[in-house]
C-alpha cells in the first residue's frame, strides 16, 4: 500500500490530483490511500512519517510549501516530495529540499502519471512483470506469469 499526501489550498487542484491518483490506481492496480491537506500547518501536525509520497503546492496560505518541506525533512528525510506550482521560478529552490520533481499547474494527467511513476519506482512499488517461457509443440511462448 502506498500512502500519499496532497498539500494544496486550491480545492479544484486538490480534487484533480485525487482523481488522477484514483485513475492511476485503477489503471495500474495499485492499492493506495491518499489524504488531502488544505494548508502546510495541518499537514505538519499529522504524522508525516506515514506518507510515502507528498505532492505539495509551493504557494500556500500561512506557511509556504517550501518552508513546510524544510520542516518535514527534519523528521522525515526519506519522504518523496513532488512540488506543485504555477511558477517555474520556484523549481530550482525545490532541489534545496531534495524534491524529486515538480508539476506545473494546470496539472494534466500525462505529467502526473510520469511523476507518480517516477516516485513509485523510488518506493519500490512499480509492478515488475515476471514472464514464463513455455515450450510446446507449436513453439516457444513467453507469457505473463500472472496469467498462468
Give residue spans per PLM region.
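A generic structural motif
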Residues: 25-34, 79
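CheY-like receiver
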Residues: 45, 51-126
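Charged phosphotransfer/docking patches of two-component systems
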Residues: 11-15, 91
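Conserved acidic carboxylate
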Residues: 8
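Short hydrophobic helical patches associated with two-component signaling proteins
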Residues: 16-21
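Helix N-cap/capping motif at the beta->alpha junctions
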Residues: 35-42, 65
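Conserved binding/recognition cores within well-folded domains
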Residues: 113-148
Amino acid at each position: 500500500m502506498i500512502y500519499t499526501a496532497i498539500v494544496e489550498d486550491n480545492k479544484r487542484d486538490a480534487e484533480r490530483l485525487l482523481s488522477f491518483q484514483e485513475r492511476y490506481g485503477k489503471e495500474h492496480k495499485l492499492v493506495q490511500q491518499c489524504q488531502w491537506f488544505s494548508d502546510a500547518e495541518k499537514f505538519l501536525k499529522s504524522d508525516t512519517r506515514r506518507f510515502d509520497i507528498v505532492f505539495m503546492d509551493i504557494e500556500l496560505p500561512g506557511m509556504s510549501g517550501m518552508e513546510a518541506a524544510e520542516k518535514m525533512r527534519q523528521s522525515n528525510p526519506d519522504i518523496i516530495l513532488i512540488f506543485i506550482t504555477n511558477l517555474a521560478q520556484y523549481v530550482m529552490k525545490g532541489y534545496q529540499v531534495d524534491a524529486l520533481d515538480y508539476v506545473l499547474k494546470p496539472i494534466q494527467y500525462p505529467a502526473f502519471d510520469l511523476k507518480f511513476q517516477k516516485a513509485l519506482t523510488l518506493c519500490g512499488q512499480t509492478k515488475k512483470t515476471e514472464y514464463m517461457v513455455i515450450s510446446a509443440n507449436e513453439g516457444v511462448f513467453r507469457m505473463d506469469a500472472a496469467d498462468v
